[in-house]
Swiss-Prot record:
It catalyses: D-altritol + NAD(+) = keto-D-tagatose + NADH + H(+). It comes from the Bacteria. One of its GO terms (molecular function) is zinc ion binding. Induction: Up-regulated by growth on D-altritol or galactitol. Gene3D superfamilies: Medium-chain alcohol dehydrogenases, catalytic domain (3.90.180.10), NAD(P)-binding Rossmann-like Domain (3.40.50.720). Zn(2+) 1 binds at C37, H59, E60. It is an enzyme of class 1 (oxidoreductase). This is D-altritol 5-dehydrogenase. Zn(2+) 2 binds at C89, C92, C95, C103. The lineage of its organism: Bacteria, Pseudomonadati, Pseudomonadota, Alphaproteobacteria, Hyphomicrobiales. Keywords: Carbohydrate metabolism, Metal-binding, NAD, Oxidoreductase, Zinc. Disulfide bonds: none annotated.
Amino acid sequence: MHAIQFVEKGRAVLAELPVADLPPGHALVRVKASGLCHTDIDVLHARYGDGAFPVIPGHEYAGEVAAVASDVTVFKAGDRVVVDPNLPCGTCASCRKGLTNLCSTLKAYGVSHNGGFAEFSVVRADHLHGIGSMPYHVAALAEPLACVVNGMQSAGIGESGVVPENALVFGAGPIGLLLALSLKSRGIATVTMADINESRLAFAQDLGLQTAVSGSEALSRQRKEFDFVADATGIAPVAEAMIPLVADGGTALFFGVCAPDARISVAPFEIFRRQLKLVGSHSLNRNIPQALAILETDGEVMARLVSHRLPLSEMLPFFTKKPSDPATMKVQFAAE
């Protein structure tokens, strides 16, 4: 089979590889759509995961079951599925508390185990979810959307009927837009998208979102006006800039992945006096079913975030250089 393979740190190739054997409890998935995420780039450069090279990247993927092991009864050949990539141990302190995304030895398809940038992928059957007739390119958004769901749950959005009056999201890339659209779907009347790129803001506006230029004087005048503010850029100064914009009693969600050594300055008295909630969110925590439910109703608009659907042979450049076109959003491998 053809696959993108990270053969060593910083080196990705298009390879011809054998299809792996099918162990008990597993299914062979014929990959139909697989999305590129910045985490894939971090894996390539050994900034994320345990540096398990060689490895096939890709943790946002959907496909058709091609075969199942003899002990698998839940799925059969021909079933249409999406993959939950996280592989927690199930026994550590975090797993016992239900925080599988914080597993002390967390593994994942596309990070420590071969993933979805290949024609076929061997996956544990209990990590598959049926997608019915949902288009594959839409279903492949389930994993990043599940990360969004985990973030909203961590922040208490929608829990016990709690819905902020308004929200602000920094970073009009695919994940930031997924978050903003999901906030709207939860009933938040006004969701504002902040970015420095005018074309991305225009796209966000076309999706029905309010927009603001990040770092602008106009935005700074909205101090203490947003009940919920999230950073989806992973840029520390942007994350720091959230705090003054949060309304009294509001919530700031650290959703983007800042560098491990990045630092921000926050006044503890301000958190205390204004009763602010600072919330972190990492990955997904068995949220694929909730993500699929959102895609059933909002999949058409969210699918607009998929800007490229390419064969494997055209995917490699997106792993090795940052796209210069701001119109590039979610790039997916689409089976020919």
